[in-house]
């Protein structure tokens, strides 16, 4: 299969992966309206084309939390990454490291902190959920500090798991799930050999290190379901802020008032995110939510954004809407499932190329020159038609 664009990796991943894994990452919550709008809304953001600007000195380099990034992109935390390629977290992290951008390890990664961190030249980031078991949270934070992780990404939009209907149909959950997954693996021999057999152990490394025993897929589902904490509040985060010495980023912000609360709390950054449309269907896409949040807190806190970003043009759009940096999730996982480290490396090269084309044709020589002025105002920052709040009957 020819890979000429980031979107090609999705089709390739669907061929490679057993359905329960493909649909787990590809799907969203409920009827998946927000999942689709994340992509659709961002695609409607119109950029101003500018010409004759002498773009010979164009640079994508930027600085975030005292780290130099080759471009304003980081790899987002994605659970079960090691089920998509053999020791997938190690491979994805290596590609990000070689590109000069951060990799974020998920709490529920297959490969533990101690396996991934020593393979990298630059410090990785670590993501943590709000969980009832505070002992696990402290243990994970201690291990992340010991491994030299620089930035903590604290996910707050998952006090309870979203209703993901695709999972029951695909075999990730539902009746006879284990038998269905086994049969799917048999029907996908490339994955079964590379990951199913040679990618073991298939436990959740960060959790296994704490519990002292392997945790398989069923254990993962059960343990997480019993440990998400709906009682969490800003006050419960104070001990984490005191414990963690480095930058702390709050992930899962969609409302300007929550963004202001993050500033008052003392966070170093926020991620404007709806969890890739995987938590609550019907909420704003990140592209819809970002401009108002940027108006509220830009300059007071670093603004990152995810959800719906599929290519370099989308990165430029998000920055023009108010983000400082973006996180890639599904896009890099499709590439990882297709070709491992080489796939992620090629994806990042494609995104870099697409960003350079977009910046050259909009007259932005540097990341700091991408702003609201880069947008066609009728379809730009105000976005009265494309990105106005959804009205009744407006669902796609």
From Swiss-Prot:
Binding site for substrate: 24, 129, 164, 278
GO terms for cellular component: plasma membrane
Zinc-finger as UniProt keyword: no
Catalysis performed (reactions): (S)-lactate + A = pyruvate + AH2
GO BP term (any one): aerobic respiration
Record keywords, A-Z: Cell inner membrane, Cell membrane, Flavoprotein, FMN, Membrane, Oxidoreductase
Transmembrane segments: none
Job description of the protein: Catalyzes the conversion of L-lactate to pyruvate. Is coupled to the respiratory chain.
Protein name: L-lactate dehydrogenase
Species assigned in the record: Salmonella schwarzengrund (strain CVM19633)
